[in-house]
């Protein structure tokens, strides 16, 4: 069963992880300023294409670098504002960015695979139906996040060791987006 069988239309929502999906991931480190943020090849054009195919595009990202004191919340927000602005300038859109800034060890964390960020997105955009949503990520926690809410899941292959089985695998976000 391929993406064309999912029946994706403008009532669907696209949930995206950030690092390793939208931008180059820094293994063993963090994107701490706009100068370190680099869109992966094809992402701007691919998301511009996807913007006409789905109703909402939402970024959900774990960013414990804030709790670790490596970047301020304002610094992280500035990176996200620049990301959204570049996307708009390219003709696409990102409707919202939700970032879990807590430590992995924090029991109150909203980090994926917990579904808090998706529920927050649904509160902001009540039309979101998780059974008509797709989660695209590059880690087990991304796929588990989507599966917990019965979303379709897409794994972007990376250096990350993944044990969870997604609905489909792709080499890059743009490879997936043009299947919508």
Where do the PLM segments sit?
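Ser/Thr-centric signal marking residues that sit
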Residues: 21, 61, 153
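Metal-dependent phosphoesterase signature
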Residues: 19-41, 66-75, 89, 102-108
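Substrate-recognition element of Asp-dependent hydrolases with the DxDx(T/V) motif
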Residues: 43, 47-80, 96-105, 146
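Active-site neighborhood of HAD-like aspartate-dependent phosphohydrolases
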Residues: 1-58
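Sparse recognition of residues in long alpha-helices and their boundaries
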Residues: 35-36, 59, 92, 162
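Flexible domain-boundary/linker segments
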Residues: 31, 36-37, 100, 114, ...
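Histidine-centered beta-alpha loop that forms part of the nucleotide-sugar donor binding/catalytic region
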Residues: 25, 62, 158
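Asp-based, Mg2+/Mn2+-dependent phosphohydrolase catalytic module
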Residues: 2-14, 74-93, 105-135, 139-180
């Amino acid at each position: 069963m391929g993406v064309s069988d999912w029946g994706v239309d403008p009532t669907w929502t696209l949930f995206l992880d950030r690092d390793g999906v939208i931008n180059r991931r820094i293994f063993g480190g963090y994107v701490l300023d706009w100068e370190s943020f680099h869109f992966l090849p094809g992402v701007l054009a691919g998301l511009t294409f996807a913007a006409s195919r789905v109703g909402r595009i939402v970024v959900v990202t774990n960013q414990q670098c804030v709790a670790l004191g490596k970047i301020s919340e304002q610094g992280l927000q500035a990176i996200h504002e620049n990301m959204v602005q570049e996307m708009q300038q390219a003709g696409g859109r990102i409707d919202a960015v939700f970032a879990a800034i807590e430590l992995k060890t924090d029991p109150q964390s909203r980090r994926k695979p917990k579904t808090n960020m998706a529920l927050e997105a649904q509160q902001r955009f009540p039309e979101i139906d998780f059974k008509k949503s797709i989660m695209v990520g590059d880690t087990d926690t991304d796929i588990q996040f989507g599966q917990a809410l019965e979303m379709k899941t897409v794994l972007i292959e990376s250096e990350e060791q993944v044990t969870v089985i997604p609905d489909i695998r792709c080499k890059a976000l743009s490879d997936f987006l043009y299947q919508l």
